[in-house]
Amino acid sequence: MRKIYQRVLLKLSGEALMGSLGYGIDPAVVQGIAQEVAEVAATGIQIAIVVGGGNIFRGVKAASKGMDRATADYVGMIATVMNAITLQDALEQVGVPTRVQTAIAMQELAEPYIRRRAIRHLEKGRVVVFGAGSGNPFFTTDTTAALRAAEIEAEVIFKATKVDGVYDSDPHKNQEAKRYESLSYGEVLTLDLRVMDSTAIALCKENNIPIIVFNLSVSGNICKAVMGEKIGTIVGGFHESKRS
C-alpha cells in the first residue's frame, strides 16, 4: 500500500467497540480493529488513537438522571481507559507495539500523557492510545481527539462511526437522507450536523486538521481511509480552502 500520510489520529467511539452487543466490548470487533491498524502500521504510517467510553458509561446521560456532571464525566474517563487497555492488548497480540497514555495518572496501568513522549513513541513505530479524555470534565472525547491531533501534529483525524459518512438526517430513520462528500467546518456548525461538537470543530479549523468520517463496520475501511481511498465524508482541509 502506498502511504499518503505520515502521522494520523484515529477516533474510535466506545459504542463502536461493542459491535452488536448492547453493552461492553465485543472481542471480535476489537480484534478486527487491531488487525486493520496492524496493516496500516506495517506501512510506516504513525498512528495515534483516541477512544471513547460510551459502551461502558456515558457521563452526559448519567448527569441528566441526577448525577453530578463533573463526577459523571470522571467516571466516563475511567471507562475510556478500560477501552484503551483492551485495545492495547488486542494490538500487541497481533504484534503491534502499543503504549497507553492517560490524562489522569494511573501509573500502574499506563503512562501519563506527555506530548514529547507520545511523539517519540510514534516516531519509533509504536501505536499510542490516549485514554481518560482530556482529563477535564465537560469536554468530550471528540474534543480530546482534536486537541491531541493538534498537539502531536497529526495530518488528519479519522472518525470511525456506524454510517458511511455525514448525512443531512439520520439514514437509519430517513431513506431519503443525503450523504455529503465534503463539508467545510462552517457548514458542519451552521447545518448542525454534529460530526463533532463545536469545540472540536473549532480546534480542527484553527489548526487546519481535516476530519474524515467513515464506517467502521465495513471490513477494510480503516486501511482504505488511511491510505487515501475516497470513502466517507471529508470535513475541512483542502475542501475548506475551496469554499473560502
Swiss-Prot record:
Enzyme Commission (EC) number: 2.7.4.22
SUPFAM superfamilies assigned: Carbamate kinase-like
Superkingdom field: Bacteria
Pathway stated in the Swiss-Prot or TrEMBL entry: Pyrimidine metabolism; CTP biosynthesis via de novo pathway; UDP from UMP (UMPK route): step 1/1
Localization per Swiss-Prot or TrEMBL: Cytoplasm
GO cellular component terms attached to this protein's record: cytoplasm
Major enzyme class: transferase
Catalyzed reactions per annotation: UMP + ATP = UDP + ADP
GO terms under biological process: 'de novo' CTP biosynthetic process; UDP biosynthetic process
Residues that, per the record, bind ATP: K11, L12, S13, G14, G54, R58, T161, Y167, D170
PANTHER family in alphabetical order: URIDYLATE KINASE, URIDYLATE KINASE PUMPKIN, CHLOROPLASTIC
Role of this protein: Catalyzes the reversible phosphorylation of UMP to UDP.
Protein name, per record: Uridylate kinase
Organism per entry: Trichodesmium erythraeum (strain IMS101)
Upper lineage: Bacteria, Bacillati, Cyanobacteriota, Cyanophyceae, Oscillatoriophycideae
Gene name in the database record: pyrH
